[in-house]
Amino acid sequence: MIPNNYHELNYSKIATYLFCPFLYKLKYIEGRREGLVAVTSLGVSIHKTLEEYHTNSNDPESLLVYYNRCFLGAGYSSAAEQMEYYLKGKRIIEDYAKREKYRQSEILGCEKEFIFEHNGWKFRGKIDRFEKLPDGSYHVIDYKTDARISDNFDVTKSLQLALYTVGTKRAWGKTQGKASIYFVALNKIFSIPFEDVNEDLVLEKYMEIGEKLEGTDFPPCTKSCIQCLFRMRCPHSIHPERHIKFHKL
């Protein structure tokens, strides 16, 4: 079955395939959904809060109002777990509000989408925050709500920021600036200047993987099972407690 957005590439597709080709098949070809768990639910709540805040207010005093309005109650195993994560998110938002008082950038858009075409492929991305800095350059920001940073994290190798940089240049004509991953729970920002991104290499990498997405071979990557939200239902899962019966959500 060929999905409707065949020949379209985005970072989520690429990241999913690199994590596990079989997971890509489940999500993007068969249309199965992962569902929410506590960590991902809080991530959705934080992202939505910051989008609503920067779109409608930019007054730090209003951030908690937006958080309470945007907090998502789904994905928690109990009321106690929901409260635990609500309080975690509240602390993240309170700390973010303190930092907001000193921000000097101009927010140009949140969840801002770019689309461009190259060699028969359509590239698409959605940027959490796009802003103009006091020096006139531009700043692309992707929020992460992780509580820790992976030991092998290297911002210079981020395929996500690389595509966002290329998209910012090609779709919007903004050539001066930087792209960043902002770990909001940890108040850490990792950036790469636009000029450090080799556009040709980035597009070549995406198209190389894109060719594989059009194939029929999607082998499982069992070393990823422990981190996969499908691990209890996937027929290839090596998770010891997975369900025997695999079914659609």
Whereabouts are the PLM-identified features?
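RecB-family 4Fe-4S metal-dependent nuclease core
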Residues: 1-249
